[in-house]
């Protein structure tokens, strides 16, 4: 028989830097999950990723105080800002343009994000990422 699920916890944690301090500790503590066990497993799973990039994670908590977790890909906005060399997006995205991306840079982001997007093919994924970039005030050339 399957384990009884008592809840899901969604967090964004920097790759390789999970520790018991907030937000990880309180979120797992409320469900009485082993915080250090999660931190060690998360850091081991993200050690090949670029340190410090935020990684969304969905933790499934079970009634027997065990857990499983699924790593998602880094948010598109973070990847767009990184490739465009920005610290933040535009306050008025359709008025003030703060950076530029080429089609090849957008393709690179789309390849990374493809598994988490609902796009049917690569071209649709590229258009999705280009739309996210435009909504941040970043111009996209060739899309």
Curated annotation (Swiss-Prot):
Record CDD domains: Ribosomal_L11
Any one of the GO BP annotations: translation
Signal sequence, renumbered to the chain: none
Domain of life of the native organism: Bacteria
Gene Ontology, cellular component aspect: cytosolic large ribosomal subunit
Any GO molecular function: structural constituent of ribosome
PTM note: One or more lysine residues are methylated.
Key words of the record: Methylation, Ribonucleoprotein, Ribosomal protein, RNA-binding, rRNA-binding
Family named by the database record: Belongs to the universal ribosomal protein uL11 family.
NCBIfam families, sorted: L11_bact
Stated role: Forms part of the ribosomal stalk which helps the ribosome interact with GTP-bound translation factors.
Record note on quaternary structure: Part of the ribosomal stalk of the 50S ribosomal subunit. Interacts with L10 and the large rRNA to form the base of the stalk. L10 forms an elongated spine to which L12 dimers bind in a sequential fashion forming a multimeric L10(L12)X complex.
Name assigned to this protein: Large ribosomal subunit protein uL11
Native source species: Nitrosomonas eutropha (strain DSM 101675 / C91 / Nm57)
Recorded name of the encoding gene: rplK
């Amino acid at each position: 028989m399957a384990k009884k699920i008592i809840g899901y916890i969604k967090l964004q944690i920097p790759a390789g830097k999970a520790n018991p301090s907030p937000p990880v500790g309180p979120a797992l503590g409320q469900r009485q999950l082993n915080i250090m066990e999660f931190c060690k497993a998360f850091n081991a799973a993200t050690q090949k990723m670029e340190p410090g990039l935020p990684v969304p994670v969905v933790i499934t908590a079970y009634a027997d105080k065990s857990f499983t977790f699924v790593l998602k890909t880094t948010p598109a906005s973070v990847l767009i800002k990184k490739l465009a060399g920005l610290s933040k997006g535009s306050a008025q995205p359709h008025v003030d343009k703060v950076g530029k991306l080429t089609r090849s840079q957008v393709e690179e982001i789309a390849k990374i994000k493809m598994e988490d997007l609902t796009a049917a093919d690569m071209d649709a994924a590229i258009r999705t990422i280009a739309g996210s970039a435009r909504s941040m005030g970043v111009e996209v050339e060739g899309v």
